[in-house]
């Protein structure tokens, strides 16, 4: 509404249907609720709906050609040549892929250092995990206690024997990958941030608990009533448990070492 009041010419609000498909999966769909946001806004602001630019974007191999054609149609709508829109779309896709590769390379380089000390993987959907007004300063709370806070999408893909082919949601696949890291590396813990009434997250919660049986983990659910105090208490308790487990592990190692010396 603020943008409409500023009398902008257009608002770019695409339907992002599918992201790149992760190896081992058959689809990489985004959230069905967020995909329909452009339609909801169009219905809510009928008198200015012509200002909304809502192309359908899919980044999987099956949809990329259609996406490029959408850029051409978008160009015609704003009064420029179709080929200009297509070329602009191709440049945008190239920059996006370059950024992803640099981001993943950064993750690969940092992984060895991150494994040396207790770290918390923050897993969830990017529109929940990243905006500070939504995540209620969760990364800062973790870092302030001396832990690394690792976004789940920074982690390189771990090959697992588990068949996840029925999982068609891109962000849920990222969470699955994070679970594999927690199971494989003792210094890695996970904080799963979920949205209230999210269907895929509701299913993922049960899988999450089964996979991490015996592990220390944190599950946070965000809704309109979530406040700093509740987050602070739960995250603090989670980190306290991690610290206690490490203290007990250190005591056990020292005890075993002393027994060896005495023997």
Mark where each language-model region is.
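An N-terminal assembly and electron-transfer interface module characteristic of large anaerobic redox
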Residues: 1-263
């Amino acid at each position: 509404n603020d943008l409409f009041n500023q009398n902008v010419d257009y608002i770019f609000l695409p339907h992002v249907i599918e992201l790149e498909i992760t190896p081992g999966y058959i689809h990489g769909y985004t959230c069905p609720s967020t995909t329909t946001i452009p339609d909801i806004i169009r219905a809510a602001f009928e008198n200015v709906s012509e200002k909304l630019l809502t192309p359908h974007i899919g980044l999987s191999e099956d949809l990329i050609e259609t996406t490029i054609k959408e850029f051409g149609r978008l160009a015609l709508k704003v009064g420029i040549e179709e080929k200009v829109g297509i070329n602009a779309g191709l440049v945008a896709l190239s920059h996006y892929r370059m950024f992803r590769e640099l981001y993943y390379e950064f993750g690969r380089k940092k992984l060895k250092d991150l494994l040396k000390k207790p770290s918390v993987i923050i897993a969830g959907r990017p529109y929940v995990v990243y905006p500070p007004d939504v995540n209620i300063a969760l990364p800062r709370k973790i870092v302030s206690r001396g832990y690394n806070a690792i976004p789940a999408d920074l982690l390189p893909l771990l090959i697992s024997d588990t068949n996840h082919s029925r999982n068609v949601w891109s962000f849920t696949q990222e969470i699955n990958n994070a679970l594999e890291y927690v199971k494989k590396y003792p210094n890695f813990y996970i904080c799963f941030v979920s949205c209230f009434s999210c269907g895929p997250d509701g299913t993922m919660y049960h899988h999450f608990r089964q996979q991490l049986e015996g592990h220390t983990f944190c599950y946070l659910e965000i809704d309109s009533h979530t406040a700093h105090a509740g987050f602070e208490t739960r995250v603090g308790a989670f980190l306290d448990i991690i610290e206690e487990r490490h203290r007990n592990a250190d005591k056990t190692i020292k005890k075993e070492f002393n027994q060896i010396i005495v023997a």
